Regions:
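Segments that shape or occlude catalytic/ligand-binding pockets
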Residues: 148, 152-234, 239-323
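Glycine-rich, flexible loop segments associated with nucleotide phosphate handling
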Residues: 134-141, 304-309, 326-329
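C-terminal soluble interaction/assembly domains
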Residues: 322-335
Length: 335
């Protein structure tokens, strides 16, 4: 957005940290404003793709995640316009799949873990809270496990936020949750997950979730919105190391130039106009406005993408008739 008239921009040296106000009877603001430290003078970074994508680094990634000599098969698969490099690893029955902007590595053990964690609180089967009573497991403190994971991400050149969610996956809880998941699948007549049945302390692990960043800007993958988890990086770590590493939507960025940025107050005006045009009795509560780098167009043929700075607005929509059915909505404005 640098093409708007300059008087639209607030030339203040600092944006506020947040705001609490009522714009209208239906639009309430109790919001935190998030933006990088270096965005103080009403300017923000405009970025472009730089350096090596995950696809370019496939050999390094394979060496980092798989011990030498263990790759039993490797091939390239085309899916539509996207190419995937696939490595099969016999030793722990793992696969590693790499495209331009995604990396998915998982062992057999990881699939058992994934079968017993339901981390989306929108759904009835949510059980993430069960894994958050403890901080540490006997095999290693959580902090140390995250430090080890961070070192691997650093070697991959992937920057992530310190804003990390950790599920402490303790074997006795996983055993119980597996029984429930199987019972639920039988009841609903859906595919029954392969059961591990025997869970021991060797299965204890940490399940970390976070998101990619660039110089403190969250970097948002192209597909976002309802039902999409903003955490595009997840890692399962146990006493044998990384059992699963998933990065969905990673783009190596560099600074293109500094651009004037619309203030959070201007964004609130835009939100007021946006919701003012919707005919509804819902109540909108603006909770957070964050300055992000958003991937808007991906060109798989050229292994490239377009990036632009955006304000992401997180709004709680409360239904006036049934307050229980409130939901979060994310709305994006050009910065």
């Amino acid at each position: 957005g640098g093409c708007g008239k300059s008087q639209q921009y607030q030339k203040s040296t600092d944006f506020p940290k947040g705001m609490k106000t009522e714009l209208t009877e239906q639009i309430k603001v109790n919001a935190e404003f998030q933006y990088p430290e270096n965005c103080k003078n009403g300017k923000c970074a405009e970025t472009q793709i730089s350096g090596q994508t995950l696809w370019d680094k496939q050999e390094e990634i394979a060496q980092l995640l798989v011990q030498d000599g263990n790759i039993t098969n490797e091939y390239i698969d085309d899916y539509g316009t996207v190419q995937y490099k696939i490595y099969e690893i016999a030793e722990n029955n793992a696969t590693l799949v790499i495209s331009d902007d995604t990396l998915n590595y998982a062992t057999d053990q990881a699939s058992y873990i994934n079968n017993v964690l339901f981390s989306d609180s929108h759904f009835d089967d949510y059980n993430g809270n069960k894994y958050q009573d403890k901080t540490d497991l006997p095999f290693m403190p959580q902090k140390e496990a995250w430090k080890n994971v961070s070192e691997v991400l650093d070697k991959l050149g992937v920057d992530v936020s310190d804003d990390v969610i950790c599920y402490v996956m303790e074997h006795s809880i996983m055993c119980e949750e597996e029984k429930k998941a199987i019972a639920r699948a039988e009841e609903e007549d859906t595919k029954i997950p392969t059961a591990k049945t025997q869970w021991t302390e060797d299965d204890d692990c940490y399940y970390f979730m976070t998101y990619t960043t660039w110089q403190d800007y969250p970097v948002l993958p192209p597909v976002m919105g309802e039902g999409f988890d903003e955490n595009n990086v997840s890692v399962i770590y146990d006493k044998n190391g990384i059992q699963s590493l998933s990065i969905n939507g990673y783009y190596p960025l560099e600074l293109k130039n500094e651009v004037e940025v619309v203030s959070p107050e201007m964004v609130l005006k835009a939100l007021e106009k946006y919701f003012g045009n919707i005919i509804s009795d819902d109540i909108y509560e603006v909770q957070r406005i964050s300055l992000c780098q958003k991937v808007v167009q991906v060109n798989p043929d050229k292994h490239s993408a377009e990036i632009e700075p955006v304000w992401e607005c997180r709004v709680l929509v409360k239904n006036s008739d049934s307050p229980d059915s409130s939901y979060l909505q994310k709305i994006y404005f050009h910065a």
